């Protein structure tokens, strides 16, 4: 998602101040989900259609592991088990709020009224739960996909690769659940006196 474009400005002049939600609104508008036909997005006016749209918007931050029968969410550089689906439930609430705001961007009066009536049904928690259940197929992941690269060390501030000795920003698609408790430092002047003493002892000073 683009992080350098302007915040999404609604037709009423207000801006969506959260950058991530703003990016999602740009994507929603580009698909025009109210036009559910073969020439457009194809997102049906149904729970299944909303599950498809939710899955497309949140695939970088929410996944359902069938083996563990649990949702996982990505934050602070790692995928973490979402016990009780608390975080993913908040994400679908954000999704519903975005869809309600999007209804105000529909220019055709009749379509806007009809689509608003449909979207408002997602205010019912039972409907949101059913959408999440449908979305498990869209966001399915195998347990073997997690931590599958043994050469990646996930630190608090990024990911270190043992293959090329590089350090980079964390990536959601590394699917790392394990994370160290320390921050990686690239400083060359950091020394461990005890370690150097140990090396000197075992080599008897022959460096």
Regions of interest found by a model, annotated:
Residues 22-23, 27-28, 54-56, 92, ...:
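Generic hydrophobic, helix-prone segments enriched in Leu/Val/Ile
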Residues 80, 87-142:
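Histidine-centered catalytic micro-motifs used for acid/base chemistry in nuclease
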Residues 1-8, 58, 62-87, 112-113, ...:
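P-loop NTPase catalytic core of nucleic-acid-dependent motor ATPases
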Residues 37-53, 115-159:
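Extended, Lys/Arg-enriched charged tracts that mediate electrostatic binding to polyanionic substrates
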């Amino acid at each position: 998602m683009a992080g350098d474009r302007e915040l999404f400005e609604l037709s009423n002049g207000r801006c969506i101040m959260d950058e991530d939600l703003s990016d999602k609104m740009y994507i929603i508008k580009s698909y025009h989900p109210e036009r559910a036909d073969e020439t457009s997005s194809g997102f049906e006016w149904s729970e299944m259609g909303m599950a498809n749209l939710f899955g497309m918007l949140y695939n970088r931050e929410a996944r359902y592991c069938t083996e563990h029968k649990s949702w996982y969410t990505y934050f602070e550089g790692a995928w973490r088990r979402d016990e009780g689906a608390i975080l993913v439930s908040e994400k679908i609430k954000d999704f519903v709020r975005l869809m309600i705001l999007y209804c105000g961007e529909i220019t055709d009066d009749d379509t806007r009224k009809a689509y608003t009536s449909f979207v408002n049904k997602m205010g019912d928690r039972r409907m949101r739960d059913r959408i999440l259940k449908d979305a498990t197929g869209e966001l399915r992941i195998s347990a073997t996909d997690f931590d599958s690269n043994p050469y990646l060390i996930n630190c608090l501030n990024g990911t270190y690769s043992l293959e090329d000795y590089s350090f980079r920003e964390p990536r959601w698609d590394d699917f790392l659940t394990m994370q160290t408790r320390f921050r990686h430092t690239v400083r060359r002047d950091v020394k461990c006196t005890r370690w150097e003493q140990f090396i000197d002892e075992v080599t008897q000073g022959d460096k």
